[in-house]
Amino acid sequence: NVFDKIKSVGLAETCKRVFWKVAFKGLRLRNKKMQQFVDENLKVSNQQYNEHDTADSNKYYDTYICGSDQIWNPDLVPTDSMYWLPFVEKGKNKIAYAPSFGASTVTEKQKEQIKANLSTFKAVSCRENSGARTINQIIGEKKCEAVLDPTMLIERDYWDTISEDKIYDEKYIFAYMLRGTAAQRKYIEKIARERNLKIVSIPFLDYEKIDPYDLKFGDYKLWDANPAEFISAIRHAEYVFCDSFHCIVFSILYHRPFFVFPKVGADGKVKKSQISRMTDLLELAEIKNRILLDNEEADLDAEIDWNNSDKRIQKARCDSERYLEQALFM
């Protein structure tokens, strides 16, 4: 029986096995719902290419756009990866839209490879000012400009058509922690108790790192959330706590009060490259005092000038659209 099994392997091992079973079930469901979302909402080619046959696409396409997010982060992706479009034939139009460098430092060898890669692009942009500066330093001229993340090119009305209806009737805090710490989650629980709010969370799942603390964190866990449910969870929250760039994006688009925990490394120190992505976005929207550093308390009643934020994002949206139009048609 179950007690004999616990005795044979130990309580700790039994709990560990139960956790992984729950986590991987959630991961499988999430992947299934994600694919369903893609099938229903994205227009994709009938042919699915991989690294071995991407060159065949030159028969059908004249323009290639790579982006966005951290596709050019040398800490995550090799500088000879497919994200630099090495398979595209000479004379074709290669455009980079809003890739992110992510890394705060780039080695001299990486710089040489990056410079060679960029020489074949017609137009280059980055998602962050810091990334644009890095590229301009590498190539020695100001050809790279900062543009909006693609999710911000689209106004809120469109995302309303994608979003699910309100998932929970009760008032809640939405928590989305890609990594985070137990202390950060406990702080969110403290806020929830003080404000008499529930916690809706999306546990972070991948095949390498799953935080066991997520198993008991939150009143409602969206193990299998798809993008429509992710947007809905932000859209209807009383407060949002996160360490995610895109969670900040949708909090801004939907005018939700949000607070950001900076990501920390294994040494417990804040990752400067990660926080720069967030500070660039907050500076663009002129939103202050949202990143919680050094156990800083959140000012839950601090107001945000959303009207000013919207105007600044709209201007950046127009500038980003202009960049794309010029890259595509001039």
Mark where each language-model region is:
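Active-site anion-handling motifs in enzyme catalytic cores
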Residues: 1-330
